Amino acid sequence: MRGILVANSTQLPIRPRPDLKVSRNANGADVVIAGLVEGSQGPTVQGLAPRAVKEAEETFGAPLVEVAIRAGGSTKIGSTVVLPWFGNSLVLVGCGAEGFDGESLRKAAGSGARAAADLSHGSSLKVAVDMGTVSAEQVRIAAEGALLGCYKVPTITATSNEPEISTVTIVSNARGAKPELNKARILADAVYTARDWVDAPANLLYPKTFAASVQSWCNNLSDVTVDVLDEKALGRGGFGGILAVGGGSAHSPRLVRVEYAPEGSTTTLALVGKGITFDSGGLNIKTAANMYTMKCDMGGAAAVLAAIGAIARLGLNVRVVAYGCLAENMPSGSGWRPSDVVTMYDGTTVENGNSDAEGRIVMADGLARACEDNPDFIVDISTLTGACMVALGNHTAGVMTSGAQAADTLLDASEAAGEDFWELPITDEVREGLHSDIADVKSSGAREGGAMLAAAFLQRFVTPGIDWAHLDIAGPAYNEASAHDYTPIQGTGFGVRTLVQLAAHMAG
């Protein structure tokens, strides 16, 4: 499959998904991945059949762990070394100290898969992950890491995107492994989908084609409905924020609403994602260097729309409503201006302080609309501020909430999912920075505390009494450095796993 067919016959490039299996042995694998663990007596190999280890050591003329260390292997999480293995290859990957946790296993499996993919040399490989997984949960985590580690940015060339790895087999005899393996497959597929969307060039992925691709992703899912509001429907509905941001582009904006409503569900989770398919900054135009990666500014919408597909496929017993607020922020004669006053969906008037602070504007319309679904918990997620990146770096996302209960719920879900968040406050002093002399509120203010200021703005559009969390994923959503563990370059799909885990917690 070369791509996802969308409404205008454009194909969005996608990454092929490897097959996923569980087996008691690694027979037939081109590459075997095992662990290097730091035990009380020094490094040891974790996984691999004892007979195979014995035969290999007879060939090497030394203990396998010694051979690995001499070749550059290490127990450091994610480090890899490749050795010959019965005519094929063995990847030994560092797992840390004995008794390592789930996230260490996920990272190690991802690192092993990336190292295995580098051995393909144009052919698709069958890979076995034999890391001593003894429980069904460990099987799921190892499978997640390995599948996510297989991902590479889809190419747009005359040749197809053939996968370096065609099959991933988790070696384990754990009881109940197959259902957990299916969970891993569904979750990885959702992360792949979010990555595919983020990686797609903005001339291929714009509001109309993004919406069409979401419809394809959600097609034929039980208890799922998809509604797309185009420019005319947005005008009739009073979505002034989305229309203002998208007004400068030849590609008109969209609001995508996806609802998953399983019979018998008693709780509702609302998800709102920023979907700026390209952010030039508008009339407050970005520099060339800061504009190049701005196809990624729809990472929040990608996360919520991919996540709801996974939630439905998992059959979780919770009602979920996801909103993708889609627009392209471009400068033109029809674009909005600094100092414009925009009337939002809920009637709030907003003075535009900077056309490059557009994400909060589309999100505000989405939040106000989502509150009408009477959710028990509402989460918005966006690549919102450079200020959050300055504060927390490229691997940690910021979370700001309505209170301790919402923060604890979100952080528990993120920890279980293996995604790193850090809570920031919203202070009264920060809120004062939103004052406008001519409108109800101003969209932006001082640079200091910019992440908190944006969160304070968004909270104005959340109905009091609803638990709310704002996730600023500007740092970890897009990787401009080298690939590491299960994280590829470019789109990471960050946030998908946390949102799915949150839904699972709410489903009980």
Curated annotation (Swiss-Prot):
Concerning Pfam families, the annotation shows: Peptidase_M17, Peptidase_M17_N
Q: How is the cofactor bound?
A: Binds 2 manganese ions per subunit.
- Name the keywords, alphabetized: Aminopeptidase, Cytoplasm, Hydrolase, Manganese, Metal-binding, Protease
Reaction(s) catalyzed by this protein? Release of an N-terminal amino acid, Xaa-|-Yaa-, in which Xaa is preferably Leu, but may be other amino acids including Pro although not Arg or Lys, and Yaa may be Pro. Amino acid amides and methyl esters are also readily hydrolyzed, but rates on arylamides are exceedingly low; Release of an N-terminal amino acid, preferentially leucine, but not glutamic or aspartic acids
Q: Which GO terms describe its cellular component?
A: cytoplasm
Record-annotated disulphide pairs: none
Entry EC no(s): 3.4.11.1, 3.4.11.10
Q: Which GO terms describe its biological process?
A: proteolysis
NCBIfam families tied to this protein: PRK00913.1-2
Physiological role: Presumably involved in the processing and regular turnover of intracellular proteins. Catalyzes the removal of unsubstituted N-terminal amino acids from various peptides.
Instruction: Quote the catalytic residue positions.
Output: 286, 360
Q: Which family does it belong to?
A: Belongs to the peptidase M17 family.
Write down the PANTHER family for this protein, in alphabetical order: CYTOSOL AMINOPEPTIDASE, LEUCINE AMINOPEPTIDASE-RELATED
Superkingdom of source: Bacteria
Q: What GO molecular function annotation could you give as one example from this UniProt entry? A: metalloaminopeptidase activity
Protein's name in the database: Probable cytosol aminopeptidase
Required co-factors? Mn(2+)
Where is the protein found, in the record's own terms? Cytoplasm
User: Which residues of this UniProt protein bind Mn(2+) 2?
Assistant: 274, 279, 297, 358
The record's gene field reads: pepA
Does the entry feature the keyword Repressor, yes or no? no
Top EC category: hydrolase
Q: Where does Mn(2+) 1 bind?
A: 279, 356, 358
